[in-house]
């Protein structure tokens, strides 16, 4: 046997071991029913990787620290309520391949510097799936703190409207989470709907935003997509800053008190097929270079397009 054949054989054996391990884990995965009278943390401690905890309707007054790949799922009406104690993170995920589905998650701590959140996805929580939940009355709704390839979709996220806007958390905060997606959520009454910072290859699409400061707020997020979102009655719609190679299309902003779209140091990007209706300025561009802005519909704005500072190579 040649050296190449030996090397290939070793890789094939390794791949087979991984496949068999995955099959064994799947074969032995259990569904564990949990009632609201039980201790949810005890059930979580007993669960093995790959298991599903199916929560009955009711209130679970606890905080969760998830350190194994499992699924926690409630009834379709989201009547399984995980209620925190107003400190820290109500649900903190630190393992990969965790799914949270059909839950109501509330009462996180309210410290912005401490990154308190209803659901917190740590860097190790790669490929997390957060779907079909009510995430209400928290600081940040979902904090994606480095969890690459995570998905947050079809959730209802409502902030604490009793606080001043700048004291509230964002609906979803994304920090350095390559490939993370935020899709088809309804986000309201927070500070920003989605705040994306220092990340790349993200997709934010199909979301609805209302009663916020900014619908989408970008900082240092490159090679990403903002598409088919709806912003209604926010201070500003899509605030995109210090980012490159963005695709911004199919979005709607209605009733923005200031700007529908803001481009601040956004370069080499495409902004097209967006609808801006009723804003102070439909588009405000500051030092936005080599962008392509085309096929947009602007209506009922005091100023249609306002360019300032150095604008080079941008086409309209």
PLM regions with names:
Residues 41, 45-49, 60-73, 81-126, ...:
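Extracellular beta-strand-rich solenoid/capping regions of secreted or surface-exposed proteins
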Residues 1-10:
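N-terminal secretory signal peptides that target proteins for export/translocation
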Residues 48, 67-68, 77, 86, ...:
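Parallel beta-helix/beta-solenoid
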Residues 281-284, 294-316:
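Soluble, non-transmembrane catalytic domains of enzymes that act on hydrophobic metabolites at membranes
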Residues 26-42, 57:
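Right-handed parallel beta-helix/beta-solenoid
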Residues 14-26:
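Bacterial N-terminal signal peptides
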Residues 83-92, 113-122, 137-144, 164-177, ...:
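Extracellular beta-strand/beta-solenoid scaffold signature
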């Amino acid at each position: 046997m040649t050296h190449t054949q030996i090397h290939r054989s070793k890789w094939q054996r390794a791949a087979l071991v991984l496949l068999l391990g995955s099959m064994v884990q799947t074969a032995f995965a259990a569904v564990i029913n949990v009632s609201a009278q039980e201790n949810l943390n005890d059930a979580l401690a007993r669960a093995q990787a790959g298991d599903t905890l199916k929560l009955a309707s009711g209130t679970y007054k606890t905080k969760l620290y998830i350190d194994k790949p499992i699924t926690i799922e409630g009834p379709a009406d989201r009547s399984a309520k995980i209620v925190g104690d107003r400190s820290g993170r109500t649900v903190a995920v630190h393992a990969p391949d965790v799914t949270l589905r059909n839950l109501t998650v509330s009462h996180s701590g309210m410290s912005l510097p401490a990154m308190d959140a209803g659901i917190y996805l740590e860097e190790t929580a790669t490929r997390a799936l957060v779907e079909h939940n009510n995430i209400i009355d928290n600081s940040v709704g979902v904090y994606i703190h480095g969890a690459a390839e995570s998905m947050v979709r079809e959730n209802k996220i409502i902030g604490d409207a009793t606080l001043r806007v700048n004291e509230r958390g964002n609906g979803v905060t994304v920090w350095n989470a390559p490939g993370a997606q935020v899709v088809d959520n309804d986000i309201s009454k927070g500070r920003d709907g989605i705040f994306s910072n220092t990340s790349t290859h993200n997709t934010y699409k199909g979301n609805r935003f209302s009663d916020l400061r900014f619908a989408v707020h970008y900082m240092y997020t490159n090679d990403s997509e903002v598409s088919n979102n709806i912003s209604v009655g926010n201070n500003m719609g899509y605030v995109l800053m210090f980012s490159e190679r963005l695709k911004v299309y199919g979005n709607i902003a209605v009733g923005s008190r200031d700007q529908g779209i803001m481009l601040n140091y956004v370069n080499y990007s495409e902004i097209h097929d967006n609808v801006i209706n009723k804003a102070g300025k439909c588009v405000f561009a500051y030092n936005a270079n080599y962008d392509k802005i085309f096929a947009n519909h602007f209506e009922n704005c005091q100023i249609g397009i306002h360019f300032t500072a150095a604008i080079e190579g941008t086409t309209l």
